[in-house]
Amino acid sequence: MTRAPLNVLLRRVDPDVPLPAYEHPGDAGADLRTTESCELKPGERAVLPTGVSVALPEGYAAFVHPRSGLAARCGVALVNAPGTVDAGYRGEIKVIVVNLDPRESVRFERFDRIAQLVVQQVERVRFQEVAELPDSARAEGGFGSTGGHAAVGADTNGQQGGNRYASVVSDRKGQ
């Protein structure tokens, strides 16, 4: 069953910026573009304007996600990914980018695609304080407790989680 697209009011802060758009059918995120050119040296970050502001319907929020190609090819990440755009916010959407590449600078030109905007329905909740939470299969297991990566497993004391290779990596000269 296909639903009708949600109408979201949008104002161009920069009259020349292309509207956010989905690159392919079925994409979850619409591409956001920067309205300013910028060069980031290794380790630098910047707040880039997108030239758009939105009015989301009550009960919705938008989330600014990184573009995987920028991460894979250039080492660009979003500092607060995902960034949250609340329904009541009317200011320009801005994206906080950081260059994580240790050697190469990255350059953004005006209207380069820098992030994706995902609009989702969100629930408001009422928090109810209790003395004890009900049991669950996971209990208090967190941060690597489910394994799935070579660096996440039993440490030398047989405890699950943690990074048993951290001391090996940090003891290498020059690292």
UniProtKB/Swiss-Prot annotation:
GO terms for molecular function: dUTP diphosphatase activity; magnesium ion binding. InterPro entries: dUTPase, dUTPase-like, dUTPase-like_sf, dUTPase_trimeric. Pathway: Pyrimidine metabolism; dUMP biosynthesis; dUMP from dCTP (dUTP route): step 2/2. Substrate binds at residues 67-69, 80, 84-86, 94. GO terms for biological process: dUMP biosynthetic process; dUTP catabolic process. Its EC number is 3.6.1.23. Belongs to the dUTPase family. This enzyme is involved in nucleotide metabolism: it produces dUMP, the immediate precursor of thymidine nucleotides and it decreases the intracellular concentration of dUTP so that uracil cannot be incorporated into DNA. This is Deoxyuridine 5'-triphosphate nucleotidohydrolase. It comes from Streptomyces avermitilis (strain ATCC 31267 / DSM 46492 / JCM 5070 / NBRC 14893 / NCIMB 12804 / NRRL 8165 / MA-4680).
